[in-house]
Structures are given as structure tokens and as C-alpha cells.
């Protein structure tokens, strides 16, 4: 009899251990106990639901109508937070203060989230994936990524970012993927990518790039993939690409390339490049329109002396200075840009540094005839797969489909507690235990 009583007590302890702390899930949500996971996706919530257990490590709130994030909404024990595809317009600067365990934060597809405070992500020392795609951002404040030394994946695509300040990514020493495509960037300065010594993939396609400083890619020694297609580049010196010793995949098509003497250094670099590259269709001069720069011969540049003829050097310098001086752009973070330099704010007045491209009027050259995309290098799409699985919880960076894809609904697996039946689940377990106890007695 004593042995039977011990068995009953053991069963009761096991049942109690399986019931989540705090008495259940928020209403209309699904919970999973180990690790504590709360899924409240696609329930039309206008605010963070109440009753999220304090020991929750993973919280999924995507596809709702949540508008604000405030301190106290989440527990510092959280490791993963998905809150993409909501209506977030404001994130209080202290919302994630003390979240030293947070590893993945998905704020993407919140199209009214147009500004971020510099300290929004301060202290997230374990964060390795940050999603800020499709957020309506037009600028990034200085220091917004400060201290994120563990970050490996940063998704900033499909915003309205027009320029990047020097050293904006300088603390991201472990970053491997930087997605900036689908923005409105028109220039890259000497310190834009400074500090990204471990960057593997840089996507800059579908911007409005027309000016690249000759040291823009200086620190990217480990870069293997660079996409610059569908921009407004007419010129890119080989010196810009020289530091990219690990480069394997390069796309330059869809730009209005000038294949005159200015293109000689790029042509020479392409002859030495052993990776895979797209075609580089010429738009000018007229005799070379439609030709591939890669397929030109040394004889095509026999009349070029040095990197460019003296006339071209003079014309290039004047064009850069004059057009940069005429371009008016007001930074949201400070005074207007220095008229002597076409990239972002600069202290004082100085002559423009050596650059790799010639800035042009954005509307001057149409890209319609710039050439077809190379068939061997299709447009890049992130290899996302739906990253939520109750059966095998992800231990490494999850892969996901594009954010515009229809979301796969999450089904409650065996053993999962749902808010609508929390009490009935506990009652059923207790009834079963008591019945077994009666049988044993």
C-alpha cells in the first residue's frame, strides 16, 4: 500500500511539472512548456496580450495590429521575439533594456516604424539576428547598432534609406550578412562599411547608387558575394574592388556603364577576377552600346593613356564637384551635407576625396537599356523557410521565406496547452491521475 501511495504522489508531481507556471497562456494564444514558448500570431491583437508567462523564452506575435512597444511588455528572460507584420509606429528606447539573453529580434514589415532611437538596441549583447526590413526607415541614427558585437545577420532591405553615416556598422565585427537592397542609397563613403571584417554577403542592388568612394570596400576582405545590379553606376574603378580577395559572386548588370577610357581599370580587374560575375553591358559610348565590358579587348583601350586621359580626369573632377554642389539633401541627423562632398555630412569644407564613380543626375540616364540580367546569376532571394517548429526547435539561425509570402499557420502539437482549454486540460490530467490512483488502491 505504501508503494502504491508513492506512485500516486509521483504522478501528481509529474503532472504539476508539466503545467506551465502562472496558470496558462494569454487568451487565444498557444503555449509550449519546454522551453517556454508563447504563440499569439494572427489574432488581430491591437496591443501586447496580457498574461504572457514571466519565464517565456520565445514569443511569437507576428501578423497582428500591435502599434506600440513599451517597457514591461516582455520579460528579460526572452531569447526570441517575432513581432513582424504589425502596425508598430513607436518603440520606446527602454523597451529591450536588460534583455541580455535576446538572440533574435524580428521587427520587420512594420511599415509605419519610420524612426528608431539610438539606444533602442543598446545592451543586447547576445543578439545575433536583427530584422528591420520593410519598416519605412529613411535614416539610421548614429550609434543605433553600437555594442552589438554578436550580431551576424542584419536585414535592412526595402526601406527608404538614402544615405549611411560613416562608422554606422563599426561595432558589428561578427556580422556576416548585410542586406541593404531596395533602398534609396545614392552614395557609399569611405567609412560606410568600416569594421565589417567578417562580412560574407553584401546586397546593395535596387538602390540609386551613382557614387562609390575608392575605400568603401576596404575592410571587406572576407566578402564572397557583392550585388550592385540595378543601380545608377556609370563608373567603378578596379581599385574599389581590389581589397575583395575572397569575392566569388559579383553582379554589376542593370547599370548605365560608360565603357570608355574610364572603364579600363574595371576591365583590367574583371580580367583577373576568377569568380562568377554578371555581364557588364555598356550604354556609352555609342559604338559600344550593348557590348559586354568583360568581353572587350586590350586594343579597345589602346588610345587611353594612364587610368584616364587628362581631359577625362579634369572633366571628371569638375563634374563631381559641380554636381555635388548642386545636390541639396538635408540630413535628418544634423546640418545639411557639405557641398564639397557627395556623401553625407562632413566636418568643415574640404575637397572631395578620390572616388570610384562619377555622380550623375539621377534622371539623366535611363536604365531601361542597360542590359539584361545575367542568366547564370538570378536575382537573389533570401533562402528563408518558415522557422517555427514545435517538434525540432531551432538551435542555429533559422531560415525563412520572403516576408511577403503567406504565413503557414501554427498547429498546436501534442502536449501543447491552449488558453481556451487550459482549465479543461488540467482537469483532464488530474481526473486521469485520480482514476489511476483509485485503481492502484
Swiss-Prot record:
Reported tissue expression: Predominantly expressed in brain. Expressed at lower levels in kidney, lung, mammary gland, placenta, salivary gland, skeletal muscle and spleen.
LRR repeats: 55-76, 77-98, 101-123, 126-147, 150-171, 174-195, 198-219, 222-243
Keyword flag Lipoprotein: yes
Membrane topology: Lipid-anchor; GPI-anchor
Annotated ranges, domain LRRCT: 255-306
Alphabetical list of Gene3D superfamilies matching this protein: Ribonuclease Inhibitor
Region (Disordered): 304-382, 397-417
Residue intervals of the LRRNT domain: 25-54
Signal peptide bounds: 1-24
Pfam family, one: LRR_8
Skewed-composition ranges (Basic residues): 326-353, 397-409
SMART domains documented for this protein: LRR_TYP (SM00369), LRRCT (SM00082)
A single GO BP: negative regulation of neuron projection development
Known partners and oligomeric status: Identified in a complex that contains RTN4R, RTN4RL1 and NGFR; the interaction depends on the presence of chondroitin sulfate proteoglycans. Does not interact with MAG, OMG and RTN4.
Described function: Cell surface receptor. Plays a functionally redundant role in postnatal brain development and in regulating axon regeneration in the adult central nervous system. Contributes to normal axon migration across the brain midline and normal formation of the corpus callosum. Protects motoneurons against apoptosis; protection against apoptosis is probably mediated by MAG. Plays a role in inhibiting neurite outgrowth and axon regeneration via its binding to neuronal chondroitin sulfate proteoglycans. Binds heparin.
Protein name per UniProt: Reticulon-4 receptor-like 1
Species, as recorded: Homo sapiens
Organism lineage string: Eukaryota, Metazoa, Chordata, Craniata, Vertebrata
Amino acid at each position: 500500500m505504501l508503494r502504491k501511495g508513492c506512485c500516486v504522489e509521483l504522478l501528481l508531481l509529474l503532472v504539476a511539472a508539466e503545467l506551465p507556471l502562472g496558470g496558462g497562456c494569454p487568451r487565444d494564444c498557444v503555449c509550449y512548456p519546454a522551453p517556454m514558448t508563447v504563440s499569439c500570431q494572427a489574432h488581430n491583437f491591437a496591443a501586447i496580450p496580457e498574461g504572457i508567462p514571466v519565464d517565456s523564452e520565445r514569443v511569437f506575435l507576428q501578423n497582428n495590429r500591435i502599434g506600440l512597444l513599451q517597457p514591461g511588455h516582455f520579460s528579460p528572460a526572452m531569447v526570441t521575439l517575432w513581432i513582424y507584420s504589425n502596425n508598430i509606429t513607436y518603440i520606446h528606447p527602454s523597451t529591450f533594456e536588460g534583455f541580455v539573453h535576446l538572440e533574435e529580434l524580428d521587427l520587420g514589415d512594420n511599415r509605419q516604424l519610420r524612426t528608431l532611437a539610438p539606444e533602442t538596441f543598446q545592451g543586447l549583447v547576445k543578439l545575433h539576428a536583427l530584422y528591420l526590413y520593410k519598416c519605412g526607415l529613411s535614416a539610421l541614427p548614429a550609434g543605433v547598432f553600437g555594442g552589438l558585437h554578436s550580431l551576424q545577420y542584419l536585414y535592412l532591405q526595402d526601406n527608404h534609406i538614402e544615405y549611411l553615416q560613416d562608422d554606422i556598422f563599426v561595432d558589428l565585427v561578427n556580422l556576416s550578412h548585410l542586406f541593404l537592397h531596395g533602398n534609396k542609397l545614392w552614395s557609399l563613403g569611405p567609412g560606410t562599411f568600416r569594421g565589417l571584417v567578417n562580412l560574407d554577403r553584401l546586397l546593395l542592388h535596387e538602390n540609386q547608387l551613382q557614387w562609390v568612394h575608392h575605400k568603401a570596400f576596404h575592410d571587406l576582405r572576407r566578402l564572397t558575394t557583392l550585388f550592385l545590379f540595378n543601380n545608377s553606376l556609370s563608373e567603378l574603378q578596379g581599385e574599389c574592388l581590389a581589397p575583395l580577395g575572397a569575392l566569388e559572386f559579383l553582379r554589376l548588370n542593370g547599370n548605365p556603364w560608360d565603357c570608355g577610357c574610364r572603364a579600363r581599370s574595371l576591365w583590367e580587374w574583371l580580367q583577373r577576377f576568377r569568380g562568377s560575375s554578371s555581364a557588364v553591358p555598356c550604354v556609352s559610348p555609342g559604338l559600344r552600346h550593348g557590348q559586354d565590358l568583360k568581353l572587350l579587348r586590350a586594343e579597345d583601350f589602346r588610345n587611353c593613356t594612364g587610368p584616364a586621359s587628362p581631359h577625362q580626369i579634369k572633366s571628371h573632377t569638375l563634374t563631381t564637384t559641380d554636381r555635388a554642389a548642386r545636390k541639396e539633401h538635408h540630413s535628418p541627423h544634423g546640418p545639411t551635407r557639405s557641398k564639397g562632398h557627395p556623401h553625407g555630412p562632413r566636418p568643415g569644407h574640404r575637397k572631395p576625396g578620390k572616388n570610384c564613380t562619377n555622380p550623375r543626375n539621377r534622371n539623366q540616364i535611363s536604365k531601361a537599356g542597360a542590359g539584361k540580367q545575367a542568366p547564370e546569376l538570378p536575382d537573389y532571394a533570401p533562402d528563408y523557410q518558415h522557422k517555427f517548429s514545435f517538434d525540432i526547435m531551432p538551435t542555429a539561425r533559422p531560415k525563412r521565406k520572403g516576408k511577403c509570402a503567406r504565413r503557414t499557420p501554427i498547429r498546436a502539437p501534442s502536449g501543447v496547452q491552449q488558453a481556451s482549454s487550459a482549465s479543461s486540460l488540467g482537469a483532464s490530467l488530474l481526473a486521469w491521475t485520480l482514476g489511476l490512483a483509485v485503481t492502484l488502491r
